[in-house]
């Protein structure tokens, strides 16, 4: 992955407030709108037979179409969130061909007018993965504190896709390699898609930026014969976030946030960031006693959140919504335009659904420099 402007194609553009093209939403230039074409062949492993196969783009700027063996697999916008396509129907035995058409500008660019260098291309990882047809569709973990912030209040909700009657869902919580909680539930019917589990963990070690104590959630699914179908892990910490008397409290303690805004930017690769550079950023922040980071002004690579969990940094997670250039437009903002309500909501809701299980996130941000309008009230109400 990388920004094509730093790979020998086209030129990067820096703008502060103004759009890099005349503002006329939702229209974008037709005389200058570079397009990147990517083609790659791949072979699907034989042992993936019978499974659903997904194609994942972690971040493409600013919009793209993709085809598998000449069949349109999908279209996506929002340069900073992943796009997942179920490509199972388009695959064949042997070699397969993937083609991607990336547009530098799209109508989504009106919501991506951040004050920074403007780049384009496939800027985050792209990968294939296979999952069983009977699988965990989604999960929500809330791990708070109770009884004077001493005990852990564990609440887990799992949604299943095509559950197999007679199969089981197993939940484990581990601490430093030791299982401290385990529960199994049998799937009773094909409509038994919801799994909820609550548990009180006495005298847990809470998570905060100074002592980022992490536990590990392990979720596994099995078929009716006891064969393992799938297993995944989610590191998490027990912590509470609340507002009291105008102060934000973490685990009942008022915290002074000493933070920075951090862009994803590399002088050689543009918007493509390595895990090694993320760790260097965190080490530098810790060296100067910083404890908070705002993902200005868009969702970051998912690895960044895992590192903030591990090293201990409070996160303000920000939606990829900035329409700074609209302040010079007669409308002033897109936040009151009915045509833009769905794009606003998609960018906020997709971010929250991706990141809601991240312990380090203590604040959700609805965007940056986009004026005020009713769409932000809608986003606020949905997020709450």
Regions found by a protein language model. Name each.
Residues 123-140, 239-254:
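Low-complexity, Pro/Ser/Thr- and charge-rich linker/hinge segments at domain boundaries
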Residues 48-52, 91-95, 200-214:
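Short glycine/proline/serine/threonine-rich loop/turn segments at secondary-structure transition edges
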Residues 1-19, 97-105, 178:
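Accessory carbohydrate-binding/adhesion or oligomerization-edge regions at the termini
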Residues 133-163:
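Surface beta-strand/loop "capping" patches
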Residues 28-29, 33-138, 163, 178, ...:
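Accessory beta-strand-rich segments of carbohydrate-active enzymes
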Residues 79-87, 107-111, 241-384:
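Active-site mouth of glycoside hydrolases
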Residues 66-68, 151-187:
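Beta-strand-rich binding/interaction modules
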Residues 104-110, 222-229:
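Short acidic/polar inter-strand loop motif in beta-rich domains
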């Amino acid at each position: 992955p990388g920004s094509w402007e730093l790979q020998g194609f086209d030129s990067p553009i820096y703008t502060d407030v103004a759009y890099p093209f005349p503002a006329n939403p939702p229209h974008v230039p037709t005389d200058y709108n570079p397009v990147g074409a990517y083609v790659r062949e791949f072979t699907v492993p034989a042992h993936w037979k019978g499974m659903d196969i997904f194609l994942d783009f972690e971040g493409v700027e600013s919009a793209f179409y993709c085809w598998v063996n000449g069949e349109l697999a999908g279209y996506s916008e929002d340069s900073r969130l992943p796009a997942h396509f179920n490509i199972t129907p388009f695959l064949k035995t042997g070699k397969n061909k993937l083609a991607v058409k990336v547009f530098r500008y799209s109508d989504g660019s009106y919501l991506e007018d951040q004050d920074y260098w403007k780049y384009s291309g496939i800027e985050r990882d792209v990968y294939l993965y296979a999952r069983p047809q009977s699988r965990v569709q989604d999960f929500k973990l809330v791990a708070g504190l109770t009884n004077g912030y001493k005990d852990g209040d564990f609440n887990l909700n799992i949604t299943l896709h095509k559950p197999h009657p007679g199969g089981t869902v197993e939940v484990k919580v581990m601490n430093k390699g030791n299982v401290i909680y385990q529960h199994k539930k049998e799937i009773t019917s094909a409509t038994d898609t919801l799994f909820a589990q609550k548990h009180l963990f006495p005298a847990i070690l809470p998570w905060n930026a100074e002592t980022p104590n992490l536990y590990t959630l392990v979720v596994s699914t099995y078929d009716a014969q006891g064969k393992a179908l799938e297993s995944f892990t989610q590191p998490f910490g027990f912590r509470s976030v609340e507002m009291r008397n105008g102060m934000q409290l973490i685990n009942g303690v008022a915290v002074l946030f000493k933070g920075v805004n951090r862009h994803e930017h590399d002088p050689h690769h543009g918007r493509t960031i390595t895990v090694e550079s993320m760790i260097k950023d965190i080490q530098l922040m810790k060296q100067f006693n910083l404890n908070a980071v705002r993902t200005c002004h868009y969702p970051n690579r998912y690895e960044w959140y895992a590192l903030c969990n591990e090293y201990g940094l409070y996160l303000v997670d920000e939606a990829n919504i900035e329409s700074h250039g609209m302040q010079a437009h007669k409308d002033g903002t897109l936040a009151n335009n009915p045509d833009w309500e769905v794009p606003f909501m998609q960018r906020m809701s997709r971010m929250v659904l991706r990141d809601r299980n991240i312990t380090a996130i203590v604040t959700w941000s609805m965007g940056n420099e986009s004026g005020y309008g009713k769409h932000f009230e809608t986003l606020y109400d949905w997020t709450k």
